[in-house]
Design a protein with these regions (language model features):
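Non-catalytic surface loops within mature trypsin-like serine protease
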Residues: 53, 141-143, 171
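Generic structural "secondary-structure junction" signal
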Residues: 120-124, 131, 183, 190-192, ...
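Short, solvent-exposed amphipathic alpha-helical segments in soluble enzyme
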Residues: 129, 153-157, 184
Length: 206
């Protein structure tokens, strides 16, 4: 995907060409609102993206040309912005939880960052969060965690108590929900660029 990864946020130089967009996806909105890279296969030179509108129900999947990308912000870049959040951001449980999580996440040495609504709000400043919004995080682990690292993951998962935490593990081959893996299921759902699959070995795909 030309170095782009799922959850990257993109701003475009112009409206997506050749796409029938919903009415809410206006030029004015897309000047402010980034597109999120999703997992899918595309033609060479294209990227699969999702558009997000002001309302929870406003979502739209499409493709764009790589040459349309003007600016990119990754989840890892957003992790460095958490400390600079204004005080009024703490009214949202997801952002309040995120701020308290930073020392714990940074101490792991793993690449990490906020995604979902929290990441979108941090990157754009747009008011898309609600009082009951989840906190979505991605952790990059390119190998199965050892016993000590597994305990660290448990600590991270237990640290958020004021909102729902959706912790995704990115293996480099795809992403899966930490909660599924921690539950000890024989197979978990791994989201890949070729589509979702059930696997017992999410770190060993070829």
């Amino acid at each position: 995907m030309h170095g782009y990864r799922a959850h990257d946020l993109l701003w475009l130089a112009a409206m997506p060409a050749g796409e029938a967009l919903p009415a809410w996806a206006s030029a004015a909105w897309l000047q402010q609102a980034p597109l999120v890279v999703r997992r899918a296969t595309t033609a060479p030179g294209c990227l699969p993206v999702g558009l997000r509108g002001p309302a929870r129900s406003q979502r739209h999947a499409c493709e764009i040309g790589v040459d349309q990308v003007l600016h990119r912000v990754t989840p890892e870049m957003l992790s460095a912005r958490v400390a600079a959040m204004p005080p009024d951001a703490m009214q949202y449980a997801a952002l309040a939880a995120l701020r308290t999580m930073v020392p714990l996440l940074d101490a792991t040495g793993w690449a990490w960052g906020p995604t979902g609504g929290a990441g979108f709000a941090l990157a754009s400043g747009l008011p898309v969060l609600r009082a009951d919004s989840d906190l979505d995080l991605v952790l990059r682990l390119d190998a199965p965690p050892d016993a000590a690292q597994t305990e660290v993951l448990r600590t991270i998962a237990a640290a958020v108590t004021n909102c729902r935490l959706d912790l995704q593990i990115d293996t480099g081959h795809g992403g899966f929900a930490y909660a599924e893996w921690a539950a000890g299921r024989s197979k978990i759902l791994l989201k890949t660029d070729q589509g979702p699959l059930l696997t017992a070995t999410p770190w060993e795909l070829v």
